[in-house]
From Swiss-Prot:
This is Endo-acting ulvan lyase. Belongs to the polysaccharide lyase family. It comes from Formosa agariphila (strain DSM 15362 / KCTC 12365 / LMG 23005 / KMM 3901 / M-2Alg 35-1). Transmembrane segments: none annotated. One of its GO terms (cellular component) is cell surface. Residues 1-23 form the signal peptide. The keyword Isomerase does not apply. The keyword Nucleotide-binding does not apply. It comes from the Bacteria. Its EC number is 4.2.2.-. InterPro entries: Chondroitin_lyas. Ulvan lyase involved in ulvan degradation. Ulvan is the main polysaccharide component of the Ulvales (green seaweed) cell wall. It is composed of disaccharide building blocks comprising 3-sulfated rhamnose (Rha3S) linked to D-glucuronic acid (GlcA), L-iduronic acid (IduA), or D-xylose (Xyl). Ulvan lyase catalyzes the endolytic cleavage of the glycosidic bond between Rha3S and the uronic acids GlcA or IduA, producing oligosaccharides that have unsaturated 4-deoxy-L-threo-hex-4-enopyranosiduronic acid (deltaUA) at the non-reducing end.
Length: 816
């Protein structure tokens, strides 16, 4: 908005308070940029190759089409698909969404080039395309206005592009000499400018759906009104009638409808203190929220929206903490590892911070973008048209040169990261050299949220260049989300790495984010971690997190501890301690573990191959509509007889000779079942097409006093550095393990104590160990030459004549 309009807005704010009563029409363009900003953008194009390249991208998309249109307008316009009678088509039936979005993207890109070049051939092309739609939609009402036939797709695609094009060519359309191509006459003719407004009002009306039910402020909603919000807001800002524009904006921002919920009172309150949208990993980015807040702040600066939602701008920087060593993201719920919205978030945040003078936020955004570009090997400037992404040109219009010599860094590799709404705790231990190969990173947790899976406390592990132990994830297409493979397996317990109680673990339908999904579960909570969320560790070798689930659906308690333990720059392992008990009858517990690979080898701790026989024990379900717990999809199931001995399972990846070594200590009677499961989504090197290896471990009774304990060592070698894993016991209670590793010819012994209370006590007089607390480690290197004592949470740790006290804190670390 121009300066004069802003001044008028300030005066009117003073006169009328917070009820907006602007009396002056918008000056266009207004949505992304103003006329006052044009020269700054042209200066960028003149000075920087990346900006020049993106202007060229706009030309590359539309120039040939504009030339063809000048010669014969009907060539392009005649190929525009028919517009359906209303917006009742399903997402699968709206097959023309891509075609309509493409032609309106051409119109908007041409309009942007008109803004940049003042060349009216671009404006004429854009106007003619828009008029084609106006001639059809001007006779309709909001209820039957559509372009592709689907009410959810229209605002995300064609409506947004239509409004952007209109905004950029607004002044051209209002020239008395402007004409548009009318197909019926096969020539350029004068036109009724009011019809553009009629169509824009129809588009906004069909998106808001004021004719439907009202909004219920504060309710739990999906991401749909966020994804449609930019397209709706763009249309509102194009309405000329000041009073109607402000009324519609009030509906969008304050009042809301059941279809397009109030941005202020329903959408924004769902952002918690962490400032991220509460869904699965890739759905949480939601850059449209920062985009909308930024545009509102540009147009209505008097609202001071940037002051009220700083938690969201802070939350934009959380996601880079969720990358695995290969740069892809951890995956919980319906999520895709390769989907990355961080750069969009940083660009929008930077634009806002620069305009508002938030120097710290501006500096942080520049640093984050600089690190992103370094990770890519340099800034890859490119505008790429996409059906569901109208914001690509903002890379140019909101582009900012990022200095190459930024020395500051944001540490996105802290050992502990918590995602509270998803019940997730991340643990990592990275190395300076070849981190993609030797870095460790895993997550544990679970919860109900939109796009959640029902998993209890699930786990995901990275190692040796792969996500070795994957969660269920999301299929490639929307259609595949609705087939039994996703709904009855990947989204359920057995499609993830968790513990199933009595063969019946399941979710329920009441409260579920999706009809017929049966995925509601309680939220897993973090009860301990060292270091705390995004804090520095006390040791470069050890860290841990413990998650707890009070499962009221399955009437059980579960607690899971994940620790990453480093033994050298090239070796390290995960410790997984899973406690589980039914609060009624403990028949049996099943520890389910998936690993990508070509084969699974089961041996005893002495190297004896375990014999297995076919079994049908996992061809069952509880009889609910989704066949919980989901393990009917296990194939080629073969089980051992129950054994007390320790077990070493090796999962082999033939492609480049990588391995996951899994050690389960002796002492508890268990049977082990190998199986093949559906292929892992987004797996590397062809494993997306190969069956996933599964190991299911069944233990009769409870698994709290005798928890499932497993040590996982990813490796590039067929032989592991971990030599033995034996249990630490307190009478009949298993409280931890002794892990002996051999690294570069030197023995490293780790005594790892994992209790179920911060006030737990363990004493082993034979080993001369005494510990008070929840989690502690004693490391002995060589023949007692170096002793390391680590208290992750606790008061005192003693070993032989060595003592470590946490004193006023709950953590401590010392090397003797």
């Amino acid at each position: 908005m121009g300066t004069s309009v802003r001044r008028i807005s300030v005066v009117l704010m003073m006169l009328f308070g917070t009820n907006f009563c602007w009396s002056q029409s918008m000056q266009h363009p207004v949505i992304w940029v103003t006329q006052d900003e044009k020269q700054d953008i042209l200066n960028l194009i003149e000075k920087y190759d990346w900006a020049k390249k993106m202007e060229h991208d706009l030309h590359a998309v539309v120039d040939k089409k504009v030339e063809a249109h000048q010669k014969k307008p009907s060539v392009i316009l005649s190929h525009i698909p028919e517009i359906p009678a209303d917006n009742s088509l399903t997402e699968f039936e709206a097959v023309t969404v891509g075609d309509h979005a493409a032609v309106l993207t051409d119109a908007s890109y041409a309009a942007m080039l008109y803004f940049l070049t003042d060349d009216e051939k671009y404006a004429q092309f854009s106007a003619d395309v828009l008029w084609h739609y106006v001639t059809v939609l001007s006779d309709r009402s909001p209820k039957n206005t559509t372009i592709c036939g689907n009410h959810f797709y229209d605002p995300r695609t064609s409506y947004a592009q239509f409004a952007l094009a209109y905004d950029f060519i607004y002044n051209f359309l209002n020239k008395p000499t402007t004409k548009v191509y009318k197909a019926s006459a096969n020539k350029q003719q004068t036109f009724d400018r009011d019809l553009f407004q009629k169509v824009l009002l129809n588009m906004v009306g069909s998106s808001l759906q004021e004719y439907g039910r009202p909004d219920t402020h504060g309710k739990f909603i999906s991401n749909h009104p966020i994804l449609t919000a930019p397209g709706v807001l763009y249309g509102i800002l194009c309405i000329e009638d000041d009073k109607e524009r402000e009324r519609l904006f009030d509906v969008f921002w304050e009042k809301g409808t059941a279809h397009q919920n109030s941005f202020k009172n329903t959408i924004l309150p769902m952002f918690g203190k962490q400032g991220i949208w509460p869904e699965s990993t890739s759905y949480s980015f939601m850059p449209a929220v920062t985009l909308v807040l930024n545009i509102i702040d540009r147009v209505y600066p008097e609202m001071q929206v940037t002051q009220n939602y700083k938690n969201i701008y802070k939350g934009n920087f959380l996601f880079d903490n969720l990358r695995m060593p290969d740069g892809r993201f951890v995956r919980y719920g319906d999520s895709k590892r390769n989907h990355d919205g961080t750069e969009q978030l940083y660009r929008y945040t930077l634009n806002l911070a620069q305009r508002r003078g938030y120097s710290n936020l501006e500096n942080q955004a520049k640093i984050a973008l600089s690190q992103a570009y370094q990770r890519q090997g340099g800034y890859q400037s490119k505008i790429s048209p996409a059906t569901f992404n109208s914001s690509e040109p903002l890379k140019l219009f909101w582009g900012t040169p990022i200095p190459k010599g930024i020395d500051s860094k944001i540490d996105f590799k802290k050992p502990t990261v918590l995602v509270e709404h998803a019940g997730i705790a991340l643990q990592r231990n990275y190395v300076e050299t070849d981190n993609e190969l030797y870095g460790l990173c895993g997550i544990i947790g679970g919860a109900h949220y939109v796009h959640s899976h029902v998993t209890g406390i699930t786990m995901e592990l990275y190692g040796a260049g792969y996500v070795m132990a994957p969660n269920g994830g999301l299929p490639k297409t929307v259609k595949e989300r609705r087939i039994p493979l996703h709904e009855n397996y990947f989204r359920l317990y057995a499609g993830n790495n968790t513990v199933i109680v009595n063969g019946t673990s399941h979710g329920i339908q009441p409260g579920s984010w999706k009809d017929g999904a049966y995925v509601w579960q309680n939220t897993v909570v973090n009860i301990a971690a060292e270091p705390k969320h995004l804090e520095d560790p006390i040791s470069e070798h050890f860290n841990f997190a413990t998650q707890f689930l009070k499962d009221t659906i399955n009437n059980c308690d579960q607690e899971r501890t994940l620790s990453t333990i480093r033994t050298s720059e090239k070796t390290g392992y995960y410790l997984d301690v899973f406690r589980s008990k039914s609060l009624t009858e403990n028949k049996f517990q099943d520890y389910i573990y998936h690993n990508i690979g070509d084969a699974t080898l089961l041996e005893t701790e002495n190297g004896e191959t375990l014999r297995t026989e076919p079994t049908t024990r996992y061809k069952t379900d509880i009889g609910d509509p989704v066949q919980s717990p989901g393990w009917r999809y296990f194939e080629d199931t073969k089980s051992t007889k129950p054994i007390h001995k320790g077990v070493h399972a090796t999962f082999k990846i033939d492609y480049d000779e990588r391995f996951m070594h899994m050690f389960v200590p002796q002492g508890v009677n268990r049977s082990y079942t190998t199986a093949l499961a559906p292929p892992t989504r987004e797996a590397k090197n062809g494993y997306e097409e190969k069956p996933t290896q599964v190991l299911a471990i069944r233990q009769d009774g409870e698994a709290w006093e005798k928890p499932f304990i497993a040590v996982f060592e990813p490796s590039v070698k067929a032989s592991s550095s971990v030599q033995t894993v034996t249990p630490l016991q307190d009478a009949d209670k298993v409280v931890g393990v002794t892990v002996i590793s051999k690294v570069n010819g030197k023995l490293i012994t780790d005594y790892i104590i994992s209790l179920d209370s911060k006030d737990g006590v363990y004493e082993n007089k034979i080993l001369k160990i005494k510990f008070e607390g929840r989690f502690g480690i004693i490391r002995v290197e060589g023949e007692q030459k170096t002793i390391s004592l680590y208290i992750g949470e606790g008061k005192t740790l003693k070993y032989n004549n060595y003592t470590l006290d946490s004193e006023t804190a709950t953590t401590a670390y010392k090397v003797f």
